């Protein structure tokens, strides 16, 4: 299970008031903690919204499942910085073992370490979160059919994803 993140995060947009500037195609982001300066130049990007959860628990297999996201369904590729794009590309071309390390912050502020990779399968590349998805599914008690929205942001130069449920899960 991931660690609890002590600082509440606030995303600007429909639900909350915006603090700070806005960059075209993104929403500004801030932490209400004293570490706000670390997020001063951070932007929040909507990466993906899915009516069937990208993560869910498969009762029959008794395992956590992470669905792949088709490249064409990613809403904004600006969530990756140039170095992260290069790493993803190198992994897809089998030039490196791992993709990009990601911290996923869920709706109750628990953090999970994952690895984002691109797999070239079929006509469109797939982006998938690996190495820890079981913990996300189990810790969040996600079931097939839960609706989620995934946002990205950088904190201290680390790629983070925020998972926001659109439908209730067993844990919240």
Swiss-Prot record:
Disulfide bonds: none annotated. InterPro entries: At2g31720-like (IPR005508), DNA-bd_pseudobarrel_sf (IPR015300). One of its GO terms (molecular function) is DNA binding. It is found in: Nucleus. One of its GO terms (cellular component) is nucleus. Pfam families: At2g31720-like. Residues 69-169 bind DNA. Keywords: DNA-binding, Nucleus, Transcription, Transcription regulation. It comes from the Eukaryota. Its main location: nucleus. This is Putative B3 domain-containing protein At1g05615. It comes from Arabidopsis thaliana (Mouse-ear cress).
